[in-house]
């Protein structure tokens, strides 16, 4: 019974991962704001097509005053990943002097860039077929103290 539950959980986890066009690891960063630091995230293309991904920061709700947007430098901001490929993205977090032990948070957003829009609409016998694609966007938290 336990084996069946483990297999089901493993199967569901893999289905969710494969449904996304790309995956990001790690899914959370905890940074030390007393000093500067460089961190790495890895992007994996789960599709048979090349992907273009844009990376930027966003302020989460409740952290309008205590965010790290001005302290984070991302490079590269736009990347291309071959089918089944893996790329590394780095970001530098500049330390905050006179930190009053507040918790700071910023979202690092990975957004798939729009591909060339190719509309494929076929009309046959008053039926319409249309291709639809989704744009994947993943946000991970960067926490600092």
Kindly give the residue locations of the regions a language model identified:
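Sec-dependent N-terminal signal peptides
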Residues: 4-14
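Short acidic, flexible loop segments centered on an aromatic residue
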Residues: 47-66, 110
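Short, solvent-exposed loop/turn segments enriched in Ser/Thr/Gly
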Residues: 34-40, 87-88, 101-107
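Terminal connector regions
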Residues: 96-145
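Beta-sheet-dominated interaction scaffolds and their linkers
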Residues: 19-46, 76-78
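Intrinsically disordered, low-complexity Pro/Gly/Ser/Thr-rich segments with frequent PxxP/GP/PP motifs
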Residues: 67-97
